[in-house]
Amino acid sequence: MQKVFDAIFEEINFKFPNYCVFNKSDSGLKIESAKGFLRVCYNNNAQLLRAGLIVKANGLDLEYTIEEQPRFDNLCFMVDCSRNSVKNVESVKKLIRNLAMLGYNSLMLYTEDVYEVKNEKLFGYLRGKYTIDELKDLDSYAVSLGIELIPCIQTLAHLNQLSRYSNRYIPFDCSDILLVNNDRTHQLIENIFSTLRECFTTNRIHIGMDEAGMLGRGRYLAINGYKDRVTILKEHLSRVCEIAEKYDFEPIIWSDMFRNEFNCDKYKNKDGKVEIPKEVIDSIPKNLSLCYWDYHGLTKEYFYDGLEMHKQYKNPVWFAGGTAMANRGILPHLQYSFKIAESAITAALEFGVKNLIETMWGDNGGECSVFAVLPALAHYSYTALGCSSERLKKEFYALTGHNFDDFIRLDYPQTFCGKYTDDIANPAKYGLYNDVFTGYLDPILNANDKKYFIQACEELKKCKEGQYFYLFKTAYALSDLLYYKYGLGIEIRKAYKEKNNEELRGCLKNLDYCIRKLEILIRLYRKQWLIENKPHGFEIQEIRLGGLLERLKGCKLRLKDYLNGKIDKIDELDECLIADAVGRVKPNNRCDEYSYMSIASVNSFDGYTYIDV
């Protein structure tokens, strides 16, 4: 118990009083408090940590009784460590403490190639991978605090970082998909399971296998001829599950390859419901769990068809929802995440799902801080536990030292100060990267919307200092930059077309502000990254933001030359912009999360890997 007490003190500076009585229980958590009396009944160490948070939040010497009965067998958080932001060991330990105090009982580290594998020297090469010793240390720490640390890997697709190497190392079918029915592939998976068995206490392992739509369409097709995807998938899945069983692992997969294959008219009955062929259901390995993932529904009914389909399987079912982070950039989208969580958890309860995962994907660079989404993690767990919003806010403050509503202000640059929370847009990212001369997005943006960023600055100023104050400083720096940059391309083009040199001189001054404020953002964001992550991967952010910095400097020089008569035109500004060219437009002239990639020129904001087939 001492390790638990030490963890509580380290995270929230709280010690149970000497008169506290601790009783082990076979059920949930129960805390009874009165003047000079405190009793904690708990089932495991994670509940004991949670008790520490609850008592700190509600006080000593006050009369109250709090009981919690978990409504789910597994309440898990999955954090993406594969998109450059490999969380450092201390950050993972801090996350483990936070999860236990918030009511979670398991953690998945999503690692495509960022972990050491014996006899695979290129696995995680130069990527900041977790070493075997680091994984052992994290597993031991998690177990001591009652958190199950579950490996979450890939054994079919999403291995594009390995596909850059010669096929003599690892054979690929096409794109990021391994060549299945291949001895070298089987040896790789054997080495993976052998290594992970040495590192982890748990018998659970998530083996991925999602989004492999081109399975069997590349080198596999050339070697074996045509087979339908489901047949190939079942053969590979059977082989991987055999290897998993050899090492006493119980695998879980993302189920979309099955879900997408059968979610079509061919397999629907007269009522429009999908009926999965019995031979498919019977062919799925018995030691396998299926994880239905869906990150977008704002009503519980949205999830019904997917959950109904999964009831047909004989295998255990997990459900994975998500914080709205993927592709969003440096800042979270918390209020949208709250709405998804409420609808998804309600649907999962109605369908009797017993295992929940809250995911935080880091697509396109892992830019958002894992601790910036603590409100979403807390809201998810408290919704799953059936706790009140009053308790959520009180206990969140006890955990972080920050008001829950202050944390929500991190949303403001993304939602125009809370004006839009019912859908996903990404102004803090596309506004950052939209070019000031070739502003592909300018035709559908409103330059006056820059006012929301100065409002966001004013709101972020209200946030008090604390252990996560560095997150607010980064968000402030980004908002401060966007106030000057968001509509700058529109203003430059308008003044240029009107030959209004006085206005152009004002734009030149704003370009200079942008340069200085971007330099501040880079400095603060670098500090934030190194607090939480291994340094590997930040070179991508330095290249992106550094490239943006040089682009702004270049535009400033050319605009200055134009105003000084050294050049008689700016070619990019002479070209007319076409609104119809902009895709993925949201209402009120906003764009979705992918639009930042759409500058006019071929670019490297989102990378592609080519391999021989």
Residue ranges and their predicted role:
Residues 1-27, 33, 47, 97, ...:
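Substrate-binding groove of N-acetylhexosamine-processing glycoside hydrolases
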